[in-house]
Amino acid sequence: MLLYIILGLLILVGDQLLKGWIVANVSYGALHTVIPNILGLTYVQNDGAAWSMLAGQQWFFYIVTIIAVGVIGYLFYTSERSEKLYRIGLTLMLAGALGNFIDRLHLKYVVDMFQLEFINFPIFNVADTALTCGVICVFIAILLKEKVTHD
């Protein structure tokens, strides 16, 4: 259990520290190339979801996040200790959801900063990455579990 708590806290604290650094050191809207033609930093304030969908609908995001945190907590609590990949995925999802929730509560928007320069993709942050990786881990864990039960 301690591993999951440490992992979640590292992601959550890292997300918040990086967001604070971005706000203090990167000009709003300006692209700063990190890896040419691959990755840049662009500070944006996102009051919606990816591609600014549902912009300004903060109460929607509050409600969805509270429900998601409850469901993730329940799934973690009821999972088997041996389901490590599944639990890691849930931990990543929880840390990501809480990282963006903190922004929404404190700032009324989410600080995003990573911009992929080689594709038209929404600017995102550490919390978004944790959420995405968590969903992938949970999906793989479920597929692997189904494969074992069918064999």
UniProtKB/Swiss-Prot annotation:
Active site residues per record: D112, D128
Listed transmembrane segments: 3-23, 59-79, 85-107, 123-143
Matching InterPro entries: Peptidase_A8
One Pfam family hit: Peptidase_A8
Subcellular location: Cell membrane
One GO term (biological process): proteolysis
Membrane topology reported for the UniProt record: Multi-pass membrane protein
EC code(s) of this entry: 3.4.23.36
Main location: membrane
Family: Belongs to the peptidase A8 family.
Known role: This protein specifically catalyzes the removal of signal peptides from prolipoproteins.
Protein name (database record): Lipoprotein signal peptidase
Organism: Latilactobacillus sakei subsp. sakei (strain 23K)
Lineage of producing organism: Bacteria, Bacillati, Bacillota, Bacilli, Lactobacillales
